């Protein structure tokens, strides 16, 4: 009946489609552990089970073999159940992370740690996998790689890092299948891994091979070559196995291979800037790279390989695939995505037409939305039937009575909680996935063995369609009976003329003769889990219509077995929907934090709490990955509280922004809503269901006492407490539940904050209806309400720590202030925290609070004792009196809102109130800003904005009038004279302002029992007067400062006083120096009542202007100096002017300011000629310019040890080169080598051939990118040349360098290297530069190369003097250009010669002329070639001629026409 499955010749079967290779390898290794070994039939059954199990992949996220085994029916054929049991045992034995190494034996016992304290968070490691085993008795055979094999392996490991468990499993499987040689393994490594990983693997493999060769390997012959060569021989199976094991071990030794590197998966987004992507890579490498691993090569490799395609093209085009990171960043700096702005066009949906649909004939919808199928456009081209499409034509379907199924097309029904409707056939209460069938002529139908599930709540009944061929097909409900040999059908299904035969049937009740008949007509039975009917050649007919049985003859054709799935408890689905966003949508690896031990008392309490949570349905047993520790905490009443330490999960969670601005202000409840009720929810968070995919992040383990056995694993089914997004998620869910209630009762108010709810209504009837609707909605959504804690008027209503009365609000607990001078720091801090909580109802100004806040400052030890001064004790008394009057009014909707702003030296106090009310609505306090100086206009504008924001947010209104304590005169002066940004804000709100002045009794007698100090602030009184124009009769004061000195100049027709002085030792700030210089200048000008002050410091200029308008002084390091300014400026008239420094303008202001700056300048070079030479080794002429005589300079050069050693002649031979006609005309470039301390430097040198100015940079390479970088740096120093001349080295003739020269419009030519005629100048410059470097390193061996090169360039360009022009190279390079000599103008020469000439560029052999030369120069002469133009002609195209005879006289016989080349 069944197919015989021999042992497969293939050593390792292929995995089923959809299952990863490393998972399939675990199943194979578990099968190879069985005794006896598995057969092909076992592998066939395993593959068929896994194929259908992949349609319900809940056991794979993560993989859970126990869950997969529970899905397997009892008595399933083959050894599939045994294979799964091996996997379950192995999974429980392998720890989730390796145990730490045992500590060395200590000399003393470590201190006992508290087992109840949660351990610190430990990073979870990667899960382990099963090792690889060979199949029983099947040796692997060598087979070379093919491209499809390499592609398949690369596809499997594309999502795993080299060295990870998944990577190693796949590679091991490939090694077992193909038995590769050393060359095959090298090809696989180059195909799979990057060059960086391949090089690291190569290093590890070399070290492992060396150790193995030293240790000795069986079969290894040292004389036959290295191990790699011998392993390439397919006959050397033992050596090949040893090499394969070493090759696999090298992966495990890679740095960072213990887990998948997170930085390896960082990819650049399509629109992400390249520098942002590189910054993310750099941060990830800093956090994840093991210590000691070089970061730079990995960063450069990933910066190219993980970049998007556009940036990779840019890097390839510029040759920066593995260049320094700066070059890669510059190459992609200007890259922007092409389609960065996308426009989404949304068209409104048009209403449906009134015409009927042409498909169904009904109006009200478009034809595209019609439920009827689209009719065919015409008759079918195959059968000419107009009722169906060509794809549905019966002629296209082969008329095969029974297609042979595929071996893997097993009809298997695994029980699922929610079957997908598209993948299931329904019938008779059974559920089964569809069978995918293909015709295989070589397959036997007997290999099909479907598993037919039965409904446990009913008998094994199934609905079947029976076609007896004598009547129409009919559907019946039949009993599946494996004990019946034949199928039994009722006689009602057959027609009266159906031929029936008598037969005897032996059943459970005995033998019967007349109850059943036998029909020989074929009967077709269609079962719901089969696509093709069952054909029975004969069956029994029940003449009494009592039985319909599907017997073994029908089931044998199905090749199926019956099984009864285990009864499962139906899940309880809460009415509240699971949140769509939890903060873990990117699904990182769940944390694996070990459970720490608990003492017996705590363990017993934990087990009791877990049992209660399990009964309540909040948790469920769990077997997946992930773990967070748990522990109980005893409360004050003796009960225990369950605590789940979710710190690791919270660190992986993205914060969800809450839409709630905070707790509502209860004073916003109108007095018209007098009827109130509170609702308290029990266990609010435990009503939000948690999606299944997030359970690994909220799993925990309850350990057994003394570790007598494995702990019990649980996971939360609902949102747990301790999760940082739980309050936000619950608040959003509760808001969605209450929103329909708010819309149904617009006249009422529902206040919600977290799980606290307050109902407010104008009448008791409305309150009762609102309460009933709210209660019903909460209960219907599964939120239980605590009836015991419900409060309702008339009665005291306590909500959010406050007591709500009909017309006012008070706090539930007002702190008591003890009056004493000695306080412990925690006591005073706790008292101020409680006062801050009730500050919105405490009638006090900012001053008492600020005084006590200052008492907390300056302490570093929490155990300090604080001693209050008398003013601070007085502040305690003021706060005690204010707290006794703590009360706030409720909002009266018929009255406008009023505001009062009081600016004081300690901060701002803002009050919101309503007229004719006994108490204000709220008191708001704000400290002074942290800036050292804050104009009062800025404070007033900030207070107005804060007041409007608070009233709009809490009351939905703006203050109609705003009172303040600034005088009208001060206010108007600030508006007219200040340029502060707060001026437009004050002008915008000026129509609401009202000045109180000294009117202390109008608004405050009811709020404060004593009059409030609302007089104008003395600090806002202007100290001095600003003059808008300069004062002609007053002197001028200039001051300035640096980090080390300060200076001032007092001038009136001449300098009256000037002084520069150093700063005191602790002060090293330029601002302090500028302020100190101004103070000294004001002190010297104290006798003048008027003064003109000129400052180049913007800080000091704005500070004085703000001080003139009135300001509040904040904290500043210059506070002692700033306190002296009002005394020196009191009652003066000042004109302020800001000067821009270093303008070099000829006006007297700039000159006097420059003179003040000069007082701060310390001479840069205060060296004697000998000291200068010892530092720079400059030449003799440079020393004479620094004050030395010629003899002294010569003696200094002779006495210098470094100069005698490296350059005895004290000069370099001159080179010969065609020089430029002006600066930046022609440059010469070269790369010279300089070796120092075993480091070879490449000096890229550029020389201007006109001035000799040099630019040099030290590099480590001679690539084109380095040459381009050095040229750009030279251009930044010397300017852009017109021509550059280099040798024909690879760096200079590369395409990149030539393209760069073309883009900069620079003409590039080459010369012969080391030729004194063509490259003499740059070679001489190289010698001068290296000679100076040798001198510097002789004197100072530890001098850095960069510093030595900078000193050498300074010496060559700025100090050494050229003998032919007595200028330095820098002076000559920046000297003004000479006027050009025009060639079109006739020039008169004192000495004239006549020449025959040939024009350059022409091949004519005829001499022209003679012509008289207009001008002669070295190498050429200016010859008039026509009547209007002249041209310079070189000597090689000239020959001298005698002066021609005058026309009127005979020729002198002595004169000869001697001609020669010039």
From Swiss-Prot:
Mg(2+) 2 binds at residues 1040, 1074, 1096, 1157. The record marks 130-131, 344-345, 449-450, 574-575, 582-583, 1021-1022, 1167-1168 as: Cleavage. One of its GO terms (biological process) is viral translational frameshifting. Signal peptide: none annotated. Its EC number is 3.4.23.-, 2.7.7.49, 2.7.7.7, 3.1.26.4. It holds the Pfam family Integrase_Zn. PROSITE patterns: ASP_PROT_RETROV, ASP_PROTEASE, INTEGRASE, INTEGRASE_DBD, RNASE_H_1, RT_POL, ZF_CCHC. A zinc finger (CCHC-type) spans 355-372, 378-395. The keyword Chloroplast does not apply. Its cofactor is Mg(2+). A motif (PPXY motif) lies at residues 118-121. The active site is at residue 481. A lipid is attached at residue 2 (N-myristoyl glycine). Gag polyprotein: Late-budding domains (L domains) are short sequence motifs essential for viral particle release. They can occur individually or in close proximity within structural proteins. They interacts with sorting cellular proteins of the multivesicular body (MVB) pathway. Most of these proteins are class E vacuolar protein sorting factors belonging to ESCRT-I, ESCRT-II or ESCRT-III complexes. Matrix protein p19 contains two L domains: a PTAP/PSAP motif which interacts with the UEV domain of TSG101, and a PPXY motif which binds to the WW domains of the ubiquitin ligase NEDD4. This is Gag-Pro-Pol polyprotein. It comes from Human T-cell leukemia virus 1 (isolate Melanesia mel5 subtype C) (HTLV-1). The lineage of its organism: Viruses, Riboviria, Pararnavirae, Artverviricota, Revtraviricetes.
């Amino acid at each position: 009946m069944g197919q015989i499955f021999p042992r497969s010749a293939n050593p390792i079967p292929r995995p089923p489609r959809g299952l990863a290779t490393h998972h399939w390898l675990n199943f194979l290794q578990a099968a190879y552990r069985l005794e006896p070994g598995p057969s092909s039939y076992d592998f066939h059954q395993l593959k068929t089970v896994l194929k259908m199990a992949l349609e319900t992949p809940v056991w794979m996220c993560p993989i859970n073999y126990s869950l997969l085994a529970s899905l397997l029916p009892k008595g399933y054929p083959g050894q599939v159940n045994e294979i799964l049991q091996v996997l379950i045992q192995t999974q429980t034995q392998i720890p989730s992370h390796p145990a730490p190494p045992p500590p060395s034996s200590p000399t003393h016992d470590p201190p006992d740690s508290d087992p109840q304290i949660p351990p610190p968070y430990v990073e979870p490691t990667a899960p382990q996998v099963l090792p690889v085993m060979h199949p029983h008795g099947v040796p692997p055979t060598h087979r070379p790689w093919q491209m499809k094999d390499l592609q398949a392996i690369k596809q499997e490991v594309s999502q795993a890092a080299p060295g990870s468990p998944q990577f190693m499993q796949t590679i091991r499987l490939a090694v077992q299948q193909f038995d590769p040689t050393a060359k095959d393994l090298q090809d696989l490594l180059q195909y799979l891994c990057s060059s960086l990983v391949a090089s690291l693997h190569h290093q590890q493999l070399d070290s492992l091979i060396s150790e193995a060769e030293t240790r000795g390997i069986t079969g290894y012959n040292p004389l036959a070559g290295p191990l790699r060569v011998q392993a390439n021989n397919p006959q050397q199976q033992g050596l090949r196995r040893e090499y394969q094991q070493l090759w696999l071990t090298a992966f495990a030794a890679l740095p960072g291979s213990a887990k998948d590197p997170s930085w390896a998966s960082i990819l650049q987004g399509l629109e992400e800037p390249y520098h942002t992507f590189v910054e993310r890579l750099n941060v990830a490498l800093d956090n994840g790279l093991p210590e000691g691993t070089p970061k730079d090569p990995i960063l450069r490799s990933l910066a190219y390989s993980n970049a998007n395609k556009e940036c990779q093209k840019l890097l390839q085009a510029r040759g920066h695939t593995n260049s320094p990171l700066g070059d890669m960043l510059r190459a992609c700096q200007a890259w922007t995505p092409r389609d960065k702005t996308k426009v989404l066009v949304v068209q409104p949906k048009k209403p449906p037409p009134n015409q009927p649909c042409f498909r169904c004939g009904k109006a009200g919808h478009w034809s595209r939305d019609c439920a009827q199928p689209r009719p065919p456009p015409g008759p079918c081209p195959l059968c000419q039937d107009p009722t169906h499409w060509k794809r549905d034509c019966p002629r296209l379907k082969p008329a095969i009575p029974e297609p042979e199924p595929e071996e893997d097309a097993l009809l298997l029904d695994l029980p699922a909680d929610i079957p997908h409707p598209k993948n299931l056939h329904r019938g008779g209460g059974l559920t089964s996935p569809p069978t995918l069938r293909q015709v295989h002529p070589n397959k036997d139908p007997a290999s099909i063995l479907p598993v037919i599930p039965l409904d446990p709540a009913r008998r094994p009944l199934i609905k079947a369609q029976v076609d007896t061929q004598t009547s129409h097909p009919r559907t019946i409900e039949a009993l599946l009976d494996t004990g019946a040999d034949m199928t039994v059908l009722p006689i009602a299904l057959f027609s009266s003329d159906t031929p029936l035969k008598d037969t005897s049937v032996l059943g459970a009740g005995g033998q019967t003769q007349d109850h059943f008949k036998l029909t020989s007509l074929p009967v077709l039975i269609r079962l719901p889990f089969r696509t093709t009917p069952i054909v029975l050649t004969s069956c029994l007919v029940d003449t009494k219509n009592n039985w319909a049985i599907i017997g073994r003859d029908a089931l044998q054709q199905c090749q199926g077995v019956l099984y009864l799935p285990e009864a499962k408890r139906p899940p309880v689905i809460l009415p509240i929907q699971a949140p769509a966003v939890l903060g873990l949508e990117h699904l990182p690896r769940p944390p694996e934090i070990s459970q720490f031990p608990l003492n017996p008392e705590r363990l017993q309490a934990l087990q009791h709490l877990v049992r209660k949570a399990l009964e309540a349905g909040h948790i469920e047993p769990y077997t997946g990955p992930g773990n967070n520790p748990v522990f109980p905490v005893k409360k004050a009443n003796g009960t225990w509280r369950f605590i789940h330490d979710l710190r690791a999960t919270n660190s992986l969670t993205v914060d969800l922004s809450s839409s709630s601005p905070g707790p509502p202000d209860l004073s916003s409840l109108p007095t018209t809503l007098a009827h109130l009720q509170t609702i308290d929810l029990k266990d609010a968070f435990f009503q939000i269901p948690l999606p299944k995919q997030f359970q690994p992040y909220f799993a925990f383990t309850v350990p057994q006492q003394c570790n007598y056995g494995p702990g019990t694993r649980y996971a939360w089914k609902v949102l747990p407490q301790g999760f940082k997004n739980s309050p936000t998620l619950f608040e959003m869910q509760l808001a969605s539940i209450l929103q329909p209630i708010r819309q149904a009762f617009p006249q009422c108010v529902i206040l919600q904050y977290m799980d606290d709810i307050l109902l407010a209504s104008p009448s008791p009837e409305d309150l009762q209806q609102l309460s009933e609707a709210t209660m019903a909605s909460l209960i219907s959504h599964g939120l239980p309400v605590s009836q015991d804690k419900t409060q309702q008027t008339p009665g005291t209503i306590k909500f959010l720590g406050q007591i709500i009365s009909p017309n006012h609000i008070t706090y539930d607990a007002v702190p008591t202030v003890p009056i004493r001078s000695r306080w412990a720091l925690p006591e005073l801090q706790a008292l101020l925290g409680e006062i801050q909580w009730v500050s919105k109802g405490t009638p006090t100004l900012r001053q008492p609070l600020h005084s006590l806040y200052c008492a907390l400052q300056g302490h570093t030890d929490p155990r300090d004792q604080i001693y209050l001064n008398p003013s601070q004790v007085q502040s305690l008394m003021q706060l005690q009196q204010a707290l006794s009057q703590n009360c706030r009014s409720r909002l009266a909707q018929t009255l406008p809102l009023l505001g009062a702003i009081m600016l004081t030296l300690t901060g701002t106090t803002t009050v919101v109130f309503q007229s004719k009310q006994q108490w204000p609505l709220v008191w708001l306090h704000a400290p002074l800003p942290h800036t050292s100086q804050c104009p009062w206009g800025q404070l007033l504008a900030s207070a107005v904005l804060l007041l409007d924001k608070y009233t709009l947010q809490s009351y939905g209104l703006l203050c109609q009038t705003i009172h303040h304590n600034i005088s009208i005169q001060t206010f108007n002066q600030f508006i007219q004279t200040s340029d502060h940004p707060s001026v437009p804000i004050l002008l915008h709100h000026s129509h609401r302002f009202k000045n109180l002045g000294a009117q202390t009794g109008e608004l405050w007698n009811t709020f404060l029992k004593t009059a409030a100090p609302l007089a104008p602030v003395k600090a806002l009184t202007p100290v001095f007067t600003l003059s808008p124009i300069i004062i002609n009769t007053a002197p001028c004061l200039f001051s300035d400062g640096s980090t080390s000195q300060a200076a001032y100049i007092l001038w009136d027709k001449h300098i009256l006083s000037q002084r520069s002085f150093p700063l005191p030792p602790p002060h090293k700030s330029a601002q302090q120096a500028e302020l100190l210089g101004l103070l000294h200048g004001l002190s010297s000008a104290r006798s003048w009542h008027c003064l003109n002050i000129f400052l180049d410091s913007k800080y000091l200029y704005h500070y004085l202007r703000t001080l003139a308008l009135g300001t509040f002084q904040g904290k500043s390091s210059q506070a002692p100096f700033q306190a002296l300014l009002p005394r020196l400026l009191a009652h003066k008239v000042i004109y302020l002017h800001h000067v821009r420094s270093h303008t070099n303008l000829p006006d007297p202001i700039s000159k006097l300011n420059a003179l003040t700056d000069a007082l701060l300048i310390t001479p840069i070079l205060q060296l004697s000629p000998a000291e200068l030479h010892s530092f720079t080794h400059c030449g003799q002429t440079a020393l004479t310019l620094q004050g030395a005589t010629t003899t002294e300079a010569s003696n200094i050069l002779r006495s210098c040890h470094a100069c005698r050693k490296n350059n005895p002649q004290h000069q370099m031979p001159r080179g010969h080169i065609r020089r430029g006609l002006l600066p930046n005309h022609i440059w010469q470039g070269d790369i010279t080598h300089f070796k120092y301390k075993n480091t070879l430097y490449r000096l890229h040198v550029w020389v201007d051939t006109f001035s000799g100015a040099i630019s040099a940079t030290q590099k480590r390479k001679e690539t084109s990118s380095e040459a381009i970088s050095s040229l750009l740096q030279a251009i930044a120093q010397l300017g852009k040349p017109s021509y550059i001349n280099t040798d024909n080295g690879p760096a200079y003739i590369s395409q990149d360098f030539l393209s760069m020269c073309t883009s900069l419009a620079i003409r590039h030519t080459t010369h012969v290297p080391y030729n004194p005629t063509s490259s003499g100048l740059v070679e001489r410059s190289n010698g001068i530069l290296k000679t100076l470097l040798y001198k510097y390193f002789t004197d100072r061996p530890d001098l850095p190369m960069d510093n030595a090169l900078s000193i050498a360039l300074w010496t060559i360009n700025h100090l050494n003097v050229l003998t032919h022009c007595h200028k330095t190279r820098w002076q000559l390079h920046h000297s003004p250009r000479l006027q050009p000599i025009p060639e079109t103008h006739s020039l008169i020469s004192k000495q004239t010669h006549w020449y025959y000439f040939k024009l350059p560029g022409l091949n004519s052999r005829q001499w022209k002329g003679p012509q008289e030369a207009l001008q002669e120069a070295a190498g050429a002469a200016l010859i008039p070639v026509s009547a209007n133009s002249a041209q310079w002609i070189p000597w090689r195209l000239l020959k001298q001629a005698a002066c021609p005879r005058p026309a009127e006289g005979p020729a002198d016989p002595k004169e000869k026409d001697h001609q020669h080349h010039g």
